[in-house]
């Protein structure tokens, strides 16, 4: 098995061509012609994840967030990214990221959020191509009061706390969602007819919502973590006898709640 064989499956699911222009999805360390015998999956690539790959014998890492977002001026072991790159190269470990390309397919990050919440009739929220785009919007199976939706969201996403705008009056029937940093899609969520928009990294001023519309911020990590299972299952399904594993340190969230 070669790295390019693994990449082909991922990019059939989420083509690299649909990633956002600022993004750096794809193979950032290694060669597509390198041999691979085992893959380790995680949300974020850190030096400790590379250490785990070495310990478990994985020669490829697949994450959602790219290790390298922009051009590096230097590669140094004193830098977090540089240390991970150096260690990966020394140990023959390839690193691949499926970021906004995995955000922009309906079965990707935001679609996984919708599935967790049980939405039906799900479609792309901000379509920029044939069936691709950021965010999703769908309907609850039945109208729910705000308090019930809050409880459902906290349960399905394993949240101890939930950040929300002022609760609206009336029932919620339609919900828009976007994994990661979704502040830019608030306008699209309102236009979609959703009474509720769920995302992460929402800024302070966006919580001043108009009548009949509300926002819930569940956190960047919490909204995206399911993509790890999606990518893992994708490779396992296509290569059932291949060695794949999800990081044992699954919680790479750098944000702590006290």
Labelled PLM ranges:
Residues 1-258:
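Active-site catalytic microenvironments in core metabolic enzymes, especially phosphate/sugar-handling
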